[in-house]
Amino acid sequence: MAVKIRLKRMGAKKNPFYRVVVADSRYPRDGRFIEEIGTYNPIVEPVQFKIDAEKVQKWIKNGAQPTDTVKSLLKKQGIIE
């Protein structure tokens, strides 16, 4: 099972917000997921990004791969190098 840490799109048309989830890479983007570990709202100023750093470290240690977008958000927060 290839596990990814990725964004799940929520909200309305032209007004998205995202949940940061751990999901099998074979599942649809907005489909089933294993665990929700945070939220990301790019619309508000300043941008809101809340995430449970301990859960991120646990999942990465267990082999989960963050997507490029999530990886850049985690680097900005200083959670990963």
From Swiss-Prot:
HAMAP family: Ribosomal_bS16. Keywords: Ribonucleoprotein, Ribosomal protein. The gene is rpsP. This is Small ribosomal subunit protein bS16. One of its GO terms (cellular component) is cytoplasm. Belongs to the bacterial ribosomal protein bS16 family. One of its GO terms (molecular function) is structural constituent of ribosome. It comes from the Bacteria. GO terms for biological process: translation. Pfam families: Ribosomal_S16.
